[in-house]
Amino acid sequence: LLFGNGGNGGNGGLLIGNSGDGGAAGNGAGISQNGPASGFGGNGGHAGTTGLIGNGGNGGAGGAGGDVSADFGGVGFGGQGGNGGAGGLLYGNGGAGGNGGAAGSPGSVTAFGGNGGSGGSGGNGGNALIGNAGAGGSAGAGGNGASAGTAGGSGGDGGKGGNGGSVGLIGNGGNGGNGGAGSLFNGAPGFGGPGGSGGASLLGPPGLAGTNGADG
C-alpha cells in the first residue's frame, strides 16, 4: 500500500514506488473475403499512477488494424497508444506515451480498390513536478490504398503524435511524438499526421515538438 511497484497498468505505492506500464493492445483480425470491415487495432493501456515519489510507467502500444485481401471490405484503423503515467507528486519522471498502431490496407482484386485506414495517435507523455517529463508516443502510419483497377483507393492519413509531458518545477519537458506518415495510393494520397507539441518546463528546457509525418 505504501511502498512498492505496480504491475502492468497498476498503481505504485502511495508513498514510494513506480507505476506499471500499460499493456500493449492486440491487433485487429484480417479478413480474406468480400464484405465486412476487418478488425480495428485495440488501444494501448494507460500506465498506472504513482504516489509521492516514483516514476510513471510507459503507455502501451496500440494494435495494428487488420488487412483485407479482397475487394469491398473495410480496413481496420490503428489503435491509439496509451498515455504515460505522471511522475510522483514530489519527485519522479513521467512515462512515455505508447506508439499508435499502423492501419490496415484493403484488397485490390477488381476495379474498385478500397481506401487505407488511418494510423493510431500516439499517447501523451506523463507530467512531472521535479523530474523529466515523458515523451509523447509516435503515431501509426496510414494504410496503403489499393492499387489495382481503374478506381484505386485513397491512402490513409497518418495519426497525430502524442504531446510531451510538462514539468511543474525543475526538469526537462517531454518531446512530442512524431506524426504518422500518409500512405501510398492509386487514388488520392494520404496526409501525414501532425507531430505532437513539446512539453513546457518552469525551470528547465522545454521539449521539442515532434516532426510532422510525410504525405503519401
Residue ranges and their predicted role:
Residues F3-G216:
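Collagen triple-helix signature
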